[in-house]
Amino acid sequence: MQLQASLSFLLILTLCLELRSELARDTIKDLLPNVCAFPMEKGPCQTYMTRWFFNFETGECELFAYGGCGGNSNNFLRKEKCEKFCKFT
């Protein structure tokens, strides 16, 4: 009987933690500036710098050539950073 109660408690605890994690993720998405929805913008300068941006249409981080100045905040040095910041799946 105690084993069944302990297992039930662990199951409920696991479900609560998962729900809390999901709610926190949704809250973060709502609080973050909508940087990930900005269009890719290379900027006015002519330097060629490989960067990553989140393509809101495809839901993927994609490579682009950044000019070195200007642009917007949808501009990441590494694909991993882009995915960490913009992909909530």
UniProtKB/Swiss-Prot annotation:
Residues 1-24 form the signal peptide. Keywords: Disulfide bond, Protease inhibitor, Secreted, Serine protease inhibitor, Signal. It is found in: Secreted. Disulfide bonds join 36-86, 45-69, 61-82. The keyword Disulfide bond applies. GO terms for molecular function: serine-type endopeptidase inhibitor activity. Gene3D superfamilies: Pancreatic trypsin inhibitor Kunitz domain. InterPro entries: Kunitz_BPTI, Kunitz_BPTI_sf, Prtase_inh_Kunz-CS, TFPI/VKTCI-like. Residues 36-86 form the BPTI/Kunitz inhibitor domain. One of its GO terms (cellular component) is extracellular region. The keyword Secreted applies. This is Kunitz-type protease inhibitor 3. The lineage of its organism: Eukaryota, Metazoa, Chordata, Craniata, Vertebrata.
